[in-house]
Amino acid sequence: MHPMALHMVLPAHLPFLSPEVLRLLEVHVKKWMHFQRWGLPRRVEESLRQLMPNPPLYYQPGNDQPVSFNLNNTSQVSLHRSETISLQTWCSCVAGQPIQTFWVSEWSTMNPEQRHHCQQTPNPMALALPSPALKALSGPHPQSGGQDNDSGSDLQQKYSQLFCGLPSLHSESLVATFMGSQGLPKIENVPKPPLKDPFLFNDLSFPQLLPKTSPQSAPPSSPLSPNWVSPSDHQRAQINVPFLTLAEYEALEWHLLQRQLQLQWGWPAALQRSQHTQCLMQHEPCGKAQSPETTTASQTGKSISVLTRELLFFPEHARKLLEFHIQKQSIRHRWGLPQKIQQSIQLLLTSTDQQTVSSSSTALANVSIPQPVALEANGACDVLSPIAAPVSIPRPHLLTQVKAILQSHIDSKCGQIHQGKIPACVHRSWDCRISGVLAVAPFPCIPESQFLVLQTASDPDLHHKVMPWMPTALDQQQQALPGTVTEHPKLLRVLSVEAIEKLETTLRHKHLAFLSGLPALYYVALPRALAPAVTSQSVITEMEPSPVEIPAEPLI
C-alpha cells in the first residue's frame, strides 16, 4: 500500500450527519484512498508535469534542508524556506518516513528497503496531523467531570476526518463542532487561510486546528518522532499547490456554479443571454465573481431572479412558449411595433370617415412606443428598459368599435339573405348581364324561381325596391314545365325555348345541391351527366335557323 494512504476512523455514532451525507462522505473517502494509493491518472500527471516542471518538496527527516520529490542519490535541490509544500510533505515529515517520489510513474524506482519501511506505519494519526496538533489532541485538556481520557480519545477519532479529503468549509465546521461539543474554546479570531491557491487537497492551515489553550494548561510532551523539524509559520499557512492563480480559481468556480444552476433549474436561453451580456458589459475585467442567485441591472436597478423550484412543474413545451414570449416582449420593448403594423394603423386612421375621426378625435391619446435608440458608451445592456419615444396611435377601444360596426353590417346582410331579400343592386347586375350578349357565367346560389324574377326585370321600380322571393315546391315546378313557359320580351330576342329550359334545369339542380350541402364538384358533374337527356329533344330544332347557337357545354 502507498505510504501516504490515510486511514479513515469514524466514530460509531454521528448524530449531526444524515444518512445521505454519510453516503457521500464514504464515496469521497473511497475516492481519496484510491487517489492516495494509485495517484493521479497518467494524463493528469502529464498535464501537471507541464504546469509544474519543478515538483513540490519534502523536508529531510535528519536536517533542515528542502529536497525534491524526485530525489536521486546524487542530486539535491535547495530552495528558500518560503517555498510552498503539500499536505503529503507534512504527513511524511511527521511520520519520519523516507522520501517518496511524487509522480506515479516513478514509484517503481523506490528501493526495497524504503518500501519495507513505508509499510510500517506507526500511527494513522501521525499521517493526518502534525506533531503540535497531535500533542494538543492527545494531551490532557481542562475538562469538567473528569472526562479527560474519554474526550481525548473521542477527539482523536473525530479529528482523523479533517485531512481525509473533506471540503475545506466542511472541515472548518467540523472543527467548530468538535471543539464546541468537547468544551474546547472555538476558533473565532484565527485568520482564514489565503485564497490565493485552491484547496486541491482540501487541507487547512495547521494554526486553525490548535485549540486556544494556555501553555500552562497543557504540559509539554515529547514529540512522536524525534527527527521531526518544525517548519516556519509562513510555510504552515501555505500548504497548497501553487499552479493556479486567484483569477483562474475564481473564474473556474464561477463557471462551475453557473453550469450547476443551469443543469439543476434549466434557465431559459433568453435569461442566459441577458445575464451573459450583463456580465460582459458591466464587469469588463470580470475579476469579481457575482452571486449566482441574482444579477442586478445597471440602469433600472431591478434584479433578474433565477427560476425557483415552483417552476419545475412546467412541461417542456410551456418553457419553450415562455421563452418565445420573453423574446417577443424584449424585441417589442426595444424596437417598438413592426413597420407594417404602424403603416396599417396609419392607413386605418386615414381611411375612416372624417366625421367619425372628428367625433372620436378627443379619445385619441399618445401611447409611448419604444423606438430603437443607440446604446450609451457606459455599457448599458438592459433590453427591458429602453428609452421610449412617443408615437400617436389610437387606443384599442377605437379598433374594437370599428370591428363591431363591421360585424353588425355583415350580420345585417346575412340576415337579409336568409330572409330571402335580394338587394336592388343585385337585380341591376342581373339585368345588365342578361340584356347584353348571352351571359356565359351562371349566377351562383340563384333560387329556382329565377325566371319569375327575370319576368319583372324590365320594371324600373325594381331598382329602388327589395325583391322578396321564396322557392317554389319541386312538384309545382314540374307541373309548370309541361305547360307554356312565360316568355320575357328581352329573352326572346337572344334565347330560344330550349336554352331557357336548359338554363332553368341547371339552376334548379344547383339550388338543390346548394340546399343539400353538396360540394362544388357536384355542381359541375350533375349538369354534365344530365346534359344529353335535356338536349336530346332540341337536336331537331337546332337544324332550323335560330338567332343564337346553343353551346355544347352547359352554362356553368
From Swiss-Prot:
Compositionally biased intervals (Polar residues): 144-154
Region listing for Disordered, in residue ranges: 133-154, 210-231
UniProt superkingdom: Eukaryota
Organism name: Homo sapiens (Human)
Coiled-coil residue windows: none
Family: Belongs to the SPATA31 family.
UniProt-recorded name of the protein: Putative protein SPATA31F2P
